[in-house]
From Swiss-Prot:
Protein name: Exosome complex component RRP42
Gene for this chain: EXOSC7
Positions bearing N-acetylalanine: A2
Molecular function in Gene Ontology: 3'-5'-RNA exonuclease activity; mRNA 3'-UTR AU-rich region binding; RNA binding
Family note: Belongs to the RNase PH family.
Length: 291
């Protein structure tokens, strides 16, 4: 993961600021930086989104392809996650430097979506045991400026909201053989319900307090962080500790409560933005180099 080197004086300055609920950029401990969300940014995908969180820049594309259901879940489709850490994001990702981080992020996404409540995978089934939709979720890290997991989870949810899957009809002839017919109408499609798709809230322990949406400088002052996967209703679906340090049980409970509280606000803001952008349709102004 991208990192910065700080002097002891800089670390003391950051830690003391956090204790007083006044971070270097003027935010409080539970405040996010400005989040920019843009959907439908890649034309050759079923759905896409780009999220900028401070200096962190994430692009997510979703492609729907037909596949065969898994043996243990014959009536469901499934999601596959791929994470590419661009060398332009940080020099540390040159060569195979970003492979470990990409695998770590993909595994975290699998854990978050490995339950029946996040996405109704039965809507992706075309013909039980024979055909289903497979959603390939490609995550590209364009720039790393701290708080990667939160930005990625926001981008994934926005891209899934933007995803349109062609409606399919299964036709059976007199001999019992089946034919699959895809609708030619681009508006005749199915959409996933993302109401229960969680977002990650990362809480970094700095000194005796914890902060959300840490910058690279703040991450350098933290020995342990807690990733909390929260739904729009404030339900925690998954937790994971990262970092070399340890967390006492009381701190974990406090961080969970903060994650639930902040997560509900994050979901409400994201939902408002994507619905507003969709309502504008072609009239919306596209920004960024993909516009």
């Amino acid at each position: 993961m991208a990192s910065v080197t700080l002097s002891e004086a800089e670390k003391v300055y950051i830690v003391h600021g956090v204790q007083e609920d006044l971070r270097v950029d003027g935010r409080g401990c539970e405040d996010y930086r400005c989040v920019e969300v843009e959907t439908d940014v890649v034309s050759n995908t079923s759905g896409s989104a780009r999220v900028k969180l401070g200096h962190t820049d994430i692009l997510v594309g979703v492609k729907a392809e037909m596949g065969t259901p898994k043996l243990e879940k014959p009536n469901e489709g499934y999601l596959e996650f791929f994470v590419d850490c661009s060398a332009s994001a940080t020099p540390e990702f040159e060569g195979r430097g970003g492979d470990d981080l990409g695998t770590e992020i993909a595994n975290t996404l699998y854990r978050i979506f490995n339950n029946k409540s996040s996405v109704d995978l039965k809507t992706l089934c075309i013909s039980p045991r024979e055909h289903c939709w497979v959603l390939y979720v490609d995550v590209l890290l364009l720039e790393c400026g701290g708080n990667l997991f939160d930005a990625i989870s926001i981008a994934v949810k926005a891209a899934l909201f933007n995803t349109r899957i062609p409606r399919v009809r299964v036709l059976e002839d007199e001999e019992g053989s089946k034919d699959i017919e895809l609708s030619d109408d681009p508006y005749d499609c199915i959409r996933l319900s993302v109401e229960n798709v969680p977002c990650i809230v990362t809480l970094c322990k700095i000194g005796y307090r914890h902060v959300v949406d840490a910058t690279l400088q703040e991450e350098a002052c933290s020995l342990a962080s807690l990733l909390v996967s929260v739904t729009s209703k404030g339900v925690v679906t998954c937790m994971r500790k990262v970092g070399k340090g340890s967390l006492d049980p009381e701190s974990i409970f406090e961080m969970m409560e903060t994650g639930k509280r902040v997560g509900k606000v994050l979901h409400a803001s994201l939902q408002s933005v994507v619905h507003k952008e969709e309502s504008l349709g072609p009239k919306r102004q596209k920004v960024g180099f993909l516009g």
